[in-house]
């Protein structure tokens, strides 16, 4: 049975006494109800950025259930709170579930960006980059390593550009999409020609990612091509073009 919708807002900005009550109650809530609660909170969180379900997510990212962990990471990353960087690094490197590791690696992207614009302590920034590079160069599942590459797109570390080039030239559409995502995250015009040439790729998700990257990099010369892509047969491509 789901939590009554009218009570869901009460999970936002919990007072200390309410947080303590939640900590005591959490183990008694069935895994299915925990997932249902977090799905509802995620929906609310997306609709209203004034809400904060940090206290619930703090429990969720310590949970034993992969889906609970996944939703906890998804919501918590939106708040960009540096105190959870260590948790995200630990999950990205050590959680037993690949989807959780991938989500946590992706969550580190925002902090990589914050470090680049001097809003994190340099040692913290380096720790994040080191963790992501370690994941990228590991034998982990492709999805986890690809999320690490995308997060590293924000980084100016010298190891990053060769890694993007390698993924771009891999011939694997998934790695190509991640390379384009990283290029967009870098906002570096050096990637301009490599992005534009992918507007005509046979794979629609590649075309969509290339369109998004063109917007991130602000490639003015790509505008005529992007306008033509508004007639693309694929909805994802058209949506990406409209965003760009």
Label for each model-derived stretch:
Residues 31-35, 66-67, 82, 98-99, ...:
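Alpha-helix N-cap/helix-start positions at coil->helix boundaries
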């Amino acid at each position: 049975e789901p939590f009554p919708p009218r009570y869901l807002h009460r999970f936002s900005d919990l007072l200390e006494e309410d947080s303590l009550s939640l900590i005591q109650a959490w183990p008694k809530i069935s895994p299915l109800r925990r997932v249902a609660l977090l799905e509802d909170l995620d929906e609310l969180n997306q609709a209203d950025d004034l809400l904060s379900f940090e206290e619930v997510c703090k429990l969720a990212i310590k949970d034993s259930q992969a889906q609970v962990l996944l939703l906890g990471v998804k919501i918590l990353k939106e708040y960009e709170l540096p105190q959870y960087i260590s948790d995200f690094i630990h999950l990205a490197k050590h959680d037993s579930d690949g989807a959780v590791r991938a989500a946590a690696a992706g969550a580190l992207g925002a902090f990589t960006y914050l470090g680049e614009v001097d809003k994190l302590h340099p040692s913290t920034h380096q720790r994040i980059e080191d963790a992501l590079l370690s994941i990228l160069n590991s034998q982990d599942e492709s999805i986890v390593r690809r999320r690490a590459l995308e997060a590293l797109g924000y980084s100016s570390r010298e190891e990053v550009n060769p890694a993007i080039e390698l993924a771009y030239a891999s011939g694997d559409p998934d790695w190509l999409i991640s390379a384009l995502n990283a290029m967009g995250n870098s906002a570096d015009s050096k990637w301009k020609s490599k992005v534009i040439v992918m507007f005509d790729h046979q794979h629609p998700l590649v075309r969509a990612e290339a369109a998004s990257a063109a917007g991130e990099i602000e490639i003015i010369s790509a505008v005529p091509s992007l306008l033509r892509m508004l007639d693309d047969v694929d909805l994802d491509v058209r949506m990406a073009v409209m965003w760009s």
